[in-house]
């Protein structure tokens, strides 16, 4: 059999407790949700769902082609302008996913002969971007500007440092100001993925780069996703107009991919406009994360202090993490379960995502369920 080796890998996963399965969710779930990335609770907001429905009625179910052919609607342009303005950048480019946005930014901005300095804790999409880039990649220790500075000092020619702004496993924030200084000293660019910062950090949720004073910096490029705080789907790259124009002409995941569906664009626009009107949602998401961490720690659990909306609780083994998450589900609570290879240090975790719309009673219930089922 051509794919007989798959059976061996499946058995190895089973022995290691690393089997993953799909679990379709119903339209109306009875579970309290601390597993999704709907940080601001906007995915089902009437303005967001109506934005999606109206866009589909007006523009159709799909984009019908790549962005360079028929896949760019007037709605795409609106979202790009409003997103760039909200985050404080000159220009923006919408792609079909946050994954595609990261591939676009890294591959198009790391040409042959360049150096890419990548944080050891980066998301898989940034790692894949580094693998596909024509430059040479050097992985440096996690959240270490001095290591970035040292790596950049060994190279002559184009260079970029690449990092998440908020790391998805433990929810810790990157030292963006320090990274920017290291890049500036060596004339390097900085590419950061703000998937977990947009809508949560910065003034009114404008993102981690905005909070660090890097919004609009000509040497900083930011990628974001529309599928977390904005409750939709898709991704975008933000930066100087010259960089965005370069991506339009050089980024393969933009050029050769079908444009983002109008419904997703409409939903993201609705969420972005709602966030502008209700900036307190960002602060509330952070408050909920802090409350979860404080109370879980008080229960004797090993919870990592959150810098944004992700709260990580360490488990003793992959098998125990799976059982713990399953027990929580049986008790009416949905939590994330992260195991190798999704965790960079090999330590399995429950991952909780704080939501701005959680009540005090729901926070207490979640902590009680997690603690009782440890």
PLM regions: where:
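N-terminal "arm"/small-domain region of PLP-dependent enzymes with the aminotransferase-like
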Residues: 2-61, 188
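Conserved PLP-binding catalytic core of the aspartate aminotransferase-like
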Residues: 5, 286-290, 297-332, 342, ...
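PLP-dependent enzyme catalytic core of the Aspartate aminotransferase-like
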Residues: 42, 46, 50, 54, ...
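Conserved N-terminal alpha-helix of the aminotransferase class I/II PLP-enzyme fold
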Residues: 50, 55-97
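Conserved PLP-anchoring active-site segment centered on the Schiff-base-forming lysine
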Residues: 105-124, 145
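Active-site phosphate-binding strand-loop segment of PLP-dependent enzymes
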Residues: 138-192
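Active-site PLP attachment segment
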Residues: 210-246
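Amphipathic alpha-helix from the class-I
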Residues: 265-283, 294-301, 317
């Amino acid at each position: 059999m051509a794919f007989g080796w798959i059976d061996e890998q499946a058995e190895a996963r089973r022995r290691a407790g690393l089997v993953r399965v799909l679990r379709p969710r119903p339209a109306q779930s009875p579970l309290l949700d601390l597993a999704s990335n709907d940080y601001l609770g906007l995915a089902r907001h009437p303005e967001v769902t109506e934005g999606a429905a109206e866009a589909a009625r007006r523009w159709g179910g799909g984009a019908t082609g790549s962005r360079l052919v028929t896949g760019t609607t007037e709605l795409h342009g609106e979202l790009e302008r409003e997103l760039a303005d909200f985050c404080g950048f000159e220009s923006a480019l919408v792609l079909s996913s946050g994954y595609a946005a990261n591939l676009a930014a890294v591959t198009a901005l790391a040409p042959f002969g360049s150096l890419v300095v990548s944080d050891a804790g980066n998301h898989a999409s940034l790692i894949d971007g580094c693998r596909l880039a024509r430059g040479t990649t050097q992985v440096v220790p996690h959240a270490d500007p001095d290591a970035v500075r040292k790596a950049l000092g060994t190279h002559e020619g184009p260079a970029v440092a690449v990092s998440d702004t908020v790391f998805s496993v433990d929810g810790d924030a990157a030292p963006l100001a320090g990274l920017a200084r290291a890049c500036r000293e060596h004339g390097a660019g900085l590419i950061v993925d703000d998937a977990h910062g947009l809508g949560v950090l910065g003034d009114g949720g404008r993102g981690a780069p905005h909070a660090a004073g890097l919004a609009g910096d000509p040497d900083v490029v930011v990628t974001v996703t529309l599928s977390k705080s904005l409750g939709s789907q898709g991704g975008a790259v933000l930066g100087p107009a010259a960089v965005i124009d370069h991506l339009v002409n050089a980024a393969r995941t933009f050029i050769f991919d079908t444009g983002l569906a109008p419904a997703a664009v409409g939903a993201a626009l609705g969420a972005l406009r709602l966030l502008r009107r209700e900036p307190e949602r960002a602060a509330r998401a952070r408050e909920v994360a802090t409350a979860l961490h404080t109370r879980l720690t008080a229960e004797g659990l090993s919870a990592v202090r959150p810098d944004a909306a992700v709260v990580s609780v360490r488990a003793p083994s992959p098998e125990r993490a799976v059982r713990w998450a399953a027990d929580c589900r049986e008790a009416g609570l949905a939590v994330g379960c992260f195991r190798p290879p999704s965790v960079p240090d090999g330590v399995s975790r429950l991952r909780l995502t704080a939501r701005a719309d959680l009540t005090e009673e729901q926070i207490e219930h979640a902590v009680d369920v997690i603690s009782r089922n440890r």
